[in-house]
């Protein structure tokens, strides 16, 4: 069921929407329960795009009714196994960010400068949830090596100076349209910054 059909069904067939979400939730929870039983699995990566540039794809009320209860149970299962959950979600989640944190997500990935720069995310929520990535994909894909280095350093100065709660990385999933030299520049600048900021460590 695509977004358009889902949106109509929310009005015309709410029982169908509830049944679909319940079944998807059951399958997801069963998969996650098996995954966290494996010793080598230390974290669950939940990729679930909830938003677009201006807000959530559906209203927060819809998410609270149909989606968040399954998130809550998933997080309970993973945390009971002593493991972590990273949420990867694109879009503007400002209206639901506090709720996602209260549900218990350990980390959040996928940030875009034109929506909300990662520095602002870290300033507002970095004391409650780990922030991963944030070097904007547009800079990585179209910027020069120097621009990538400058942006990487700016992100680190704002988000990593305390040494906790932030992990350097791309703003979204690494893609084959990022020039290799730009990706390497981001990593190299991160290592340089760490050596300068935390001398005597292996970071």
Task: Give the ranges of each region predicted by the language model.
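Active-site loop segments of alpha/beta catalytic cores
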Residues: 1-203
């Amino acid at each position: 069921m695509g977004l358009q059909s889902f949106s109509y069904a929310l009005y015309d067939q709410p029982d169908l929407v509830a049944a679909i979400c319940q079944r998807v939730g059951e399958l997801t929870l069963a998969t996650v329960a098996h995954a966290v039983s494996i010793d080598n699995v230390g974290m669950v990566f939940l990729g679930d795009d909830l938003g677009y540039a201006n807000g959530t794809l559906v209203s927060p009320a819809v998410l609270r009714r149909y989606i968040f209860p399954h998130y809550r149970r998933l997080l309970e299962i993973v945390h009971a196994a002593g493991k972590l959950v990273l949420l990867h979600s694109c879009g503007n989640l400002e209206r639901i960010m506090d709720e996602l944190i209260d549900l218990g997500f350990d980390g959040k990935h996928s940030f875009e400068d034109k929506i909300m720069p990662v520095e602002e995310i870290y300033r507002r929520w970095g004391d409650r949830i780990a922030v991963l990535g944030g070097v904007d994909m547009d800079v990585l894909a179209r910027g020069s090596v120097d621009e990538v280095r400058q942006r990487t350093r700016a992100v680190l100065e704002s988000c990593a100076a305390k040494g906790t709660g932030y992990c350097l990385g791309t703003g979204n999933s690494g893609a084959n349209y990022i020039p290799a030299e730009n990706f390497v520049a981001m990593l190299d600048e991160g290592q340089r910054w760490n050596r300068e900021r935390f001398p005597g460590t292996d970071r």
